[in-house]
């Protein structure tokens, strides 16, 4: 009763045999391969011992233990590398050595794990913390004030230095600005002239001058016929007086009339498109002002040229009673009456032509044909393009 019984420690239950298979096996350590030269027989011979001829075994052979099944991971990792390596359980490699100890073992190669792409190729394009600049004001490193540049904006100076004659000379800024502004204004106002603009302007000027000549010709023709009828008297009874007075004016007046008539005819024909004769005739039938005026001037020019010989005879007039006279007695009426009528018709024609032109002074078909030919010269091409589209 005096002695207390000491309680024994509680024994642990035995582990089942199946738990061994579930325990993960560690990899066997590499063993140094033993050379085949150091066999037991060689060792005995070197020591001076002789082997007996008896072949009976001195000690019983060890029984081979049955190989137990290991986990799939350990078995596959060992068998794939070297099937001749023995299996190790719980690190006890002394008990599980095979009889083939002299056999050389192949060294197992360690499989290198593939590195990630991020480790092999570092991201050099990434943004570092040093590259990030905050939105606030950047700190200016402290430097010597002698080497610091002024942070103020530069102010304009009144004088500028301009290179003249390979030297820089001071000049006032305001004068330079004024000259540059004047040059800019001059360049902006000055238009750019082309050959078509020059020809079109010359055509307009000639048309205006021609219209003035047409009006002057109409007035001159009327004045001429009035002078003739005044000098001839009533019913042309005083023709010798007309010849004696008008012989000084006959030749110059007829030449001046011819000059004005030619200029007016050219101006009138310049208003119609002579390249298309059919259109000109159609305009004459439709009483187009330019076409009608051209026709009147052409007829008047033809009539004036038909009476040029009579004007020459009037210029060399001498009385029939004198020797060498080109005029015979009682022939003045036969020669002068047709000439007076023709001058009257010419005056009427040029007056009507000027009236037609003055009603439509801006009409000019030749300008449309010469300076705007693209609209009418290629109508078939435009039709072909429309058909293809």
Curated annotation (Swiss-Prot):
Localization per record: Membrane; Cell projection, Cilium
Ranges of Polar residues composition bias in the record: 47-57, 74-84
Region (Disordered): 1-116
Transmembrane segments: 211-231, 248-268, 284-304, 339-359
Gene Ontology cellular-component terms listed: ciliary transition zone; membrane
This protein's record includes keyword Membrane: yes
Membrane topology recorded in Swiss-Prot or TrEMBL: Multi-pass membrane protein
Keyword Coiled coil belongs to the record: no
Keywords linked to the UniProt accession: Cell projection, Cilium, Cilium biogenesis/degradation, Membrane, Transmembrane, Transmembrane helix
Basic residues composition-biased segments: 105-114
Chief localization: membrane
GO biological process: cilium assembly; regulation of Wnt signaling pathway
Function per UniProt: Component of the transition zone in primary cilia. Required for ciliogenesis.
Family (UniProt): Belongs to the TMEM237 family.
Official protein name in the record: Transmembrane protein 237
């Amino acid at each position: 009763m005096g002695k207390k019984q000491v309680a024994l420690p509680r024994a642990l239950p035995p582990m089942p045999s199946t738990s061994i298979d579930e325990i993960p096996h560690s990899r066997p350590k590499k063993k140094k391969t033993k050379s085949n030269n150091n066999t037991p027989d060689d060792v005995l011979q070197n020591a001076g011992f002789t082997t007996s001829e008896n072949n009976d075994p001195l000690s019983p052979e060890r029984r081979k233990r049955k190989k137990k099944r290991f986990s799939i991971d350990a078995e596959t990792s060992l068998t794939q590398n070297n099937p001749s390596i023995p299996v190790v359980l719980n690190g006890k490699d002394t008990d599980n050595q095979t009889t083939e100890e002299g056999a050389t073992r192949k060294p197992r190669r360690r499989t290198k794990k593939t590195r990630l792409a991020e480790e092999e190729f570092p991201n050099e394009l990434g943004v570092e913390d040093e590259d990030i600049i905050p939105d606030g004001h950047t700190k200016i490193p402290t430097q010597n004030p002698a080497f610091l540049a002024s942070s103020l904006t530069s102010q304009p100076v009144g004088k500028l230095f301009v290179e003249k004659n390979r030297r820089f000379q001071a000049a006032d800024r305001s004068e330079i600005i004024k000259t540059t502004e004047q040059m800019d204004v001059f360049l902006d106002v000055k238009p750019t002239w082309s050959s078509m603009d020059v020809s079109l302007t010359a055509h307009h000027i000639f048309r205006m001058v021609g219209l003035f000549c047409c009006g002057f010709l109409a007035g001159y023709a009327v004045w001429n016929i009035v002078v003739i009828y005044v000098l001839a008297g009533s019913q042309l009874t005083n023709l010798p007086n007309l010849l004696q007075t008008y012989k000084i004016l006959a030749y110059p007046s007829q030449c001046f009339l011819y000059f004005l008539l030619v200029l007016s005819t050219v101006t009138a024909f310049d208003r119609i498109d002579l390249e298309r004769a059919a259109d000109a005739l159609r305009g004459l039938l439709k009483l187009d002002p330019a076409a009608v005026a051209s026709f009147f001037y052409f007829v008047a020019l033809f009539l004036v040229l038909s009476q040029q010989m009579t004007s020459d005879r009037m210029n060399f007039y001498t009385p029939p009673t004198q020797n060498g006279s080109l005029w015979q007695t009682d022939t003045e009426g036969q020669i002068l009456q047709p000439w007076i009528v023709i001058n009257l018709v010419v005056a009427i024609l040029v007056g009507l032509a000027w009236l037609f032109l003055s009603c439509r002074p801006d009409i000019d078909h030749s300008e449309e044909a010469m300076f705007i030919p693209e609209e009418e010269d290629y109508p078939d091409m435009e039709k072909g393009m429309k058909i293809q589209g």
